[in-house]
Curated annotation (Swiss-Prot):
Pfam families recorded: Herpes_UL52
Keywords annotated in UniProt: DNA replication, Host nucleus, Host-virus interaction, Metal-binding, Transferase, Zinc, Zinc-finger
GO molecular function: DNA-directed RNA polymerase activity; zinc ion binding
GO cellular component: host cell nucleus
Main localization (coarse): host cell
Catalytic EC class: transferase
EC number(s) from the headed UniProt entry: 2.7.7.-
Region entry Disordered, spans: 596-626
Protein's job: Essential component of the helicase/primase complex. Unwinds the DNA at the replication forks and generates single-stranded DNA for both leading and lagging strand synthesis. The primase initiates primer synthesis and thereby produces large amount of short RNA primers on the lagging strand that the polymerase elongates using dNTPs.
Entry's localization field: Host nucleus
The protein, known as: DNA primase
Oligomer and partners: Associates with the helicase and the primase-associated factor to form the helicase-primase factor. Interacts with host SNAPIN.
Gene expressing this chain: UL70
Length: 946
C-alpha cells in the first residue's frame, strides 16, 4: 500500500472529519512525503502522538487511487482538494479505523430506522471523531513546526522524516539527524525559511532531489543503527566485565561506570567514530558501516580499561605508576650534606626520666609565654608567632646564640627561656616534642616536654611477667598483655598527660615513623567481628604495608620490619557509637594549623565518619562471622598503624606522608586476599586520613583515651595494642612486644629505638617525593582525576589566567607568576571589589579591620591562595572573627583569598576565614564573599558577589 504523510493549513482534525462526512469545503491537503508501493489504495497518514512498537504514523482515511490519480498531483506539486478526496474515499477501508467510536446505534427520526451509512455515522459522532483525532495525532499547520523538529535544511528534513516516520525502528530524531549528517557529508540542501507557507514547503519537498536518495539512506541508516547497537553492546560488555573482575570499592565502582561511558562516548571519540562509519558512495549497501569493527570498544580499552587494569593491580600499580625520589646523603658526620649537617635531628629528651619536666599551658598562657620569650631574646633571636606555630618553631629550632655571644653562651638556645631549669640544659640541644592534652569540659593544654616517666606512669611493673618469649600466635600474645583501665579524667594537666595525649605534627622536623590513622568504615548491619577476622585484617594490612615499603623505599625486610597496630577499644553498650569523636575547640583556641590547609582534624574526621551512609547494602553479623564477637564496634573500626621508614631513611616534608597515605589507601583495595576479607564487612576506600600530616595537626598517641564529650569527665575508646609479630621474631616475640611499648617507636619525629639488626643497611637517605603519576594530587583519586580529562569544558590554567589579567593577551603564555606579580594583581584588581563588598555588607567593627589606618599585607601561598595579614611594625597580625563577637575575642582568625578559574579568562576570588572556636565549627572554612573578575579587555560591570 502507498502511504502519504500530509499536512493542512487549517485544523487537520476538522478537515479530516469533513472528508469522512463527505462535506465539501474549499480546503486542501498538502502531501509532504510518499512511500510508494504497488496498490490501488492510498492511505493518508498523520504523525501519532504516541508510538506503539515504533509506529510513528497512522492512516486517517483511505482513497481509491484509480479515482484520485495521486501521481498527477505529485508531478505537478499541487495540493489535493477535498472534493477529489471525497470523490475517491474508500469507505470500506476507512470505516474500520473509527468503528470503535460508533458503539451506540443511531436512529434517524426521518427514516424511522438505524443509521448505517459511514458519512452519517461520522456526522452524528462528529465530536467523538474530532476528540479522537486531536488525542491520537499531531496536527501541525505550519512548516516552522517541521523545521524546528526535523531540521533546517532540505535534505535534513526530508531524509529525517522519511526514515523516522515511515521505517519501524527505535532511533530518536537526534540519532536520525546524526545519520543524515554522516550520509550527506558535503551538502544537506538549501536552508528552508521559517516563514514559508505550507504550499511552498510541500512543493519544496515534492521537488527535492533528495527524494531519489531516500532508499539509499534508509539502507544506510539500518546498517548504521545495527553497527551502533553492536558497538554499544560491546562497550557495555567490556565495562561490566572489568567491573566484575576488578576489586573496586562501592563508590569507586559507581564512579567508574560513569567515567567509562564518558570516556567511550566522549565528543572527540564520537567524531572519530562518525568518520569511520560515514556513508561510502562507492561501497555496496551490504558493505556500509563495516570498517574497523569494535572501534569504540578498542578505544575504551586503550584509553581507560588497559590503564585501569594496571592501575588496579597492586604489583603493576607500584611498579608503573608510583614514582619515588630519594636523596642519598653523605655518611661523614662532618659533611654539610650529612644528616647532622642538614639538621635532620629528631626528638631528644628522656622518656624514662625521674620526673615530668616541661611547659604546660593553655592557648592564652602559651601566647603570653611566647610574648615573654620574644621580649627576653629580641636582640638575639627572631620573634616567634604568639600561637602554637611559634611553639612548634621554638621546639624544632637548632639555632643557638653563637652569632651574637662568646664562650659558653654560644650554645644557649631560645628553648632555655621556655625551660630554664639548669638540669634540663643537656636535653634542650635537640628538638622537643609538642603535645596537646585533652582535659575535662573540653579544655586543652599544650605541652613541650623534655623529660617524662612513660613506662612508670603508664604501665604496671609486672606488665610483661606473663608474656612468653617463645612461639605464640598473635592472638594469644595479645591476650597476655593486660593494661589497667581508668575511666575518670583528672583536671591536672600533668596527670592527664598520660591519658589523653596527642602528638602535634611539626613540619620543621624530619619524620622517622609513619603514623597512620586508619578508620575502616563498616557496612550497615555489621555489629560484631570475630577475633580471627580482626587479626587477619591486621596481618593483611601488614602485608600491604611491607609490599608498599619494599617497592617505594627498598631495604625493607618483611620478615623483620616492625609494624605496630593499635585498636580503639570498643564502645560500651551504654555509650552511643557516635559519641566517640566530637570536634574540640573553644573561644580561646589559638591557631595551630598550616595556613594552606582547611581539612578537619583527626577528631573531627572520626565524628564525620560516624554519619551513617544510606548508600550501602545491609549485611547481618551472622553472615559475616558466626564465632563470638571479639570487636563490638559499629560504624567504623579505628586502628592506629605505625611503622618506621627503612633504616637511615627520613621524610622531610608533609606532602611525602600524604602521598604515601594516598598510595596505601589505593593499595589496601588491591590486595586480593585482604579484599576478600574486607568486602563483606566494610568500605575500605580512603581509610587513611591524610589530614593529620599538616603542620600543627595532632593525632592521639597509642595507649591514650578519648574524652567523652557528653559526660565531660569520662574517658573511653583507649588505643590498645594488637601484636602482629614479624616472622623473624616469632620464636622470641618479647623483644618486639617491648618495642611496641616504647614511646620512641610511636612518634612522628623520634628516631626508632631498638630496631632489629638488618643484613644490609642503606646509606643515609631523604625521601624527597612520592608521586602517583596518574593522580598527583592527594585530593583526588584515579576516577576523579580521569573524569576531569573527559569533561566538556576544561578550566584554563591559573597561571595563564593570572598572566592574562596582568599583561593582557601578550602574557597569556607566561610560564610562571612570581609572588610579586601575584601581590600586584591582588592589590590592583582583586582586593578593591572584595573590600567594597566587605564594607557594604558587614558590620563596621568587622570591616574597619581592613581599612585605614591598618596596613594590609598579602602573602601568597602558592598561585591559588593568598593570606591577608595586618602589618604591625616588623610583625604581622591576624584578625578578629568575621562571623561572631566571641566572649573572649582574639586576633587569631586567619583570612585568605582563594583564586580559581573557569573555561574563560574570568577570575573568581573568594574571601574566607578560619576561626578556631567551636561556635565557628572548629577551624572550618567560612567563605564570606565570592566575586567574578572579568579580564581587562572585557566590559567591567560591578563585580558580582555570591
Amino acid at each position: 500500500m502507498t502511504l502519504v504523510l500530509f499536512a493542512t493549513e487549517y485544523d487537520s482534525a476538522h478537515i479530516v472529519a469533513n472528508v469522512l462526512s463527505q462535506t465539501p469545503t474549499d480546503h486542501c491537503v498538502f502531501p509532504l512525503l510518499v512511500k510508494h508501493q504497488v496498490s490501488r489504495r492510498v492511505y493518508f497518514c498523520l504523525q501519532t502522538q504516541k508510538c506503539s512498537d515504533s509506529r510513528r504514523v497512522a492512516p486517517v482515511f483511505a482513497v481509491n487511487n484509480e479515482t484520485l490519480q495521486l501521481s498527477r498531483y505529485l508531478a505537478a506539486r499541487q495540493p489535493i482538494p477535498l472534493s477529489a478526496l471525497i470523490a475517491s474515499l474508500d469507505e470500506a477501508e476507512t470505516q474500520p479505523l473509527y468503528r470503535h467510536l460508533f458503539r451506540t446505534p443511531v436512529l434517524s427520526p426521518e427514516h424511522g430506522g438505524e443509521v448505517r451509512e459511514f458519512k452519517h455515522l461520522v456526522y452524528f459522532h462528529h465530536a467523538a471523531v474530532l476528540r479522537h483525532l486531536n488525542q491520537v495525532f499531531l496536527c501541525p499547520t505550519s512548516p516552522s513546526w517541521f523545521i524546528s523538529v526535523f531540521g533546517h535544511t532540505e535534505g535534513q528534513v526530508l531524509l529525517t522524516m522519511a526514515y523516522y516516520l515511515f521505517e519501524g525502528q527505535y532511533s530518536t530524531i537526534s540519532t536520525v539527524e546524526e545519520y543524515v549528517r554522516s550520509f550527506c557529508t558535503r551538502d544537506l540542501g538549501t536552508i528552508i525559511p521559517t516563514h514559508a507557507s505550507m504550499g511552498e514547503f510541500a512543493r519544496l519537498l515534492l521537488g527535492s532531489p533528495f527524494r531519489q536518495r531516500v532508499s539509499a539512506f534508509v539502507a544506510y541508516a539500518v546498517a548504521r543503527n545495527r553497527r551502533d547497537y553492536t558497538e554499544l553492546e560491546q562497550v557495555d560488555t567490556q565495562i561490566n566485565a572489568f567491573r566484575e573482575r576488578a576489586r573496586l570499592p562501592d563508590t569507586v565502582c559507581v564512579h567508574y561506570v560513569y567515567l567509562a561511558y564518558r570516556t567511550a562516548l566522549a565528543r572527540a571519540r564520537l567524531l572519530e567514530y562518525r568518520r569511520v562509519v560515514a556513508y561510502d558512495a562507492d561501497a555496496a549497501p551490504e558493505a556500509q558501516c563495516t570498517r574497523e569493527p569494535g572501534f569504540l570498544g578498542r578505544r575504551l580499552s586503550t584509553e581507560l580499561l588497559d590503564v585501569m587494569q594496571k592501575y588496579f593491580s597492586l604489583d603493576n600499580f607500584l611498579h608503573d605508576y608510583v614514582e619515588t625520589h630519594l636523596l642519598r646523603l653523605d655518611e661523614s658526620p662532618h659533611s654539610a650534606t650529612s644528616p647532622h649537617g642538614l639538621g635532620l635531628a629528631g626528638y631528644g629528651g628522656r622518656i624514662d626520666g625521674t620526673h615530668l619536666a616541661g611547659f604546660f599551658g593553655t592557648s592564652t598562657q602559651l601566647a603570653r609565654q611566647l610574648e615573654r620569650i620574644n621580649t627576653l631574646s629580641e636582640s638575639v633571636f627572631s620573634p616567634l608567632e604568639r600561637s602554637l606555630s611559634g611553639l612548634l618553631r621554638l621546639c624544632a629550632s637548632l639555632r643557638t646564640a653563637q652569632t651574637y655571644t662568646t664562650g659558653t653562651l654560644t650554645r644557649y638556645s631560645q628553648r632555655r627561656y621556655l625551660l630554664p631549669e639548669p638540669a634540663l640544659a643537656p636535653l634542650l640541644e635537640r628538638p622537643l616534642p609538642v603535645y596537646r592534652v585533652h582535659l575535662p569540659n573540653d579544655q586543652h593544654v599544650f605541652c613541650a616536654v623534655a623529660s617524662e616517666t612513660w613506662h612508670r606512669s603508664l604501665f604496671p611493673r609486672d606488665l610483661l611477667r606473663h608474656v612468653p618469649d617463645s612461639r605464640f600466635s598473635d592472638e594469644a600474645l595479645t591476650e597476655t598483655v593486660w593494661l589497667h583501665d581508668d575511666d575518670v579524667a583528672s583536671t591536672s594537666p600533668e596527670t592527664q598527660f598520660y591519658y589523653t595525649r596527642h602528638e602535634v605534627f611539626n613540619e620543621r622536623l624530619p619524620v622517622f615513623n609513619f603514623v597512620a590513622d586508619f578508620d575502616l568504615r563498616l557496612r550497615d548491619g555489621v555489629s560484631g567481628l570475630a577475633r580471627h577476622t580482626v587479626f587477619e585484617l591486621c596481618r593483611g594490612l601488614r602485608r600491604v604495608w611491607m609490599t608498599v615499603w619494599a617497592s617505594l623505599f627498598g631495604y625493607t625486610h618483611p620478615d623483620r620490619h616492625p609494624v605496630y597496630f593499635f585498636k580503639s577499644a570498643c564502645p560500651p553498650n551504654s555509650v552511643p557509637v557516635d559519641a566517640a569523636g566530637a570536634p574540640f575547640d573553644d573561644d580561646d583556641y589559638l591557631d595551630y594549623r598550616d595556613e594552606r590547609d582547611t581539612e578537619e582534624d583527626e577528631d573531627g574526621k572520626e565524628n564525620k565518619n560516624n554519619v551513617p551512609d544510606n548508600g550501602v547494602f545491609q549485611k547481618t553479623t551472622s553472615s559475616v562471622d558466626t564465632s563470638p564477637p571479639y570487636c563490638r564496634c559499629k560504624g567504623k573500626l579505628g586502628l592506629r598503624i605505625i611503622t618506621p621508614f627503612p633504616a637511615c631513611t627520613v621524610a622531610v616534608h608533609p606532602s611525602v606522608l600524604r602521598a604515601v597515605a594516598q598510595v596505601l589507601n589505593h593499595a589496601v583495595c588491591l590486595d586480593a586476599e585482604l579484599h576478600t576479607l574486607l568486602d563483606p564487612i566494610s568500605h575500605p576506600e580512603s581509610s587513611l586520613d591524610t589530614g593529620i600530616y599538616h603542620h600543627g595537626r595532632s593525632v592521639r598517641l597509642p595507649y591514650m583515651y578519648k574524652m567523652d564529650q557528653d559526660d565531660g569527665y569520662f574517658m573511653h575508646r583507649r588505643l590498645l595494642p594488637l601484636f602482629i609479630v614479624p616472622d623473624a621474631y616469632r620464636e622470641h616475640p618479647l623483644g618486639f612486644v617491648r618495642a611496641q611499648l616504647d614511646l620512641r617507636n610511636l612518634l612522628h619525629h623520634h628516631p626508632p629505638h631498638d630496631l632489629p639488626a638488618l643484613p644490609l643497611s642503606p646509606p643515609p637517605r631523604v625521601i624527597l617525593s612520592v608521586r602517583d603519576k596518574i593522580c598527583p594530587s592527594t585530593e583526588a583519586n584515579f576516577i576523579e582525576t580521569r573524569s576531569l580529562n573527559v569533561t566538556r569544558y576544561r578550566r584554563r590554567g591559573l597561571t595563564e589566567v593570572l598572566a592574562y589579567h596582568l599583561y593582557g593577551g601578550d602574557g597569556a603564555t607566561a610560564a610562571a607568576i612570581s609572588d610579586t606579580d601575584l601581590q600586584r594583581l591582588v592589590v590592583t584588581r582583586v582586593w578593591p571589589p572584595l573590600l567594597e563588598h566587605l564594607t557594604q555588607h558587614y558590620e563596621p567593627h568587622v570591616s574597619e579591620q581592613f581599612t585605614a589606618p591598618h596596613v594590609l599585607l598579602f602573602q601568597p601561598h602558592g598561585a591559588c591562595c593568598v593570606a591577608v595579614k595586618r602589618r604591625d611594625g616588623a610583625r604581622t597580625r591576624d584578625f578578629r572573627c568575621l562571623n561572631y563577637t566571641h566572649r573572649n575575642p582574639q586576633e587569631t582568625v586567619q583570612v585568605f583569598i582563594d583564586l580559581r578559574t573557569e573555561h574563560s579568562y574570568a577570575l573568581w576570588a573568594s574571601l574566607w576565614s578560619r576561626c578556631f572556636t567551636k561556635k565557628c565549627h572548629s577551624n572550618a572554612k567560612n567563605v564570606h564573599i565570592s566575586i567574578k573578575i572579568r579580564p581587562p579587555d572585557a566590559p567591567m560591570p560591578p563585580a558580582t558577589a555570591v
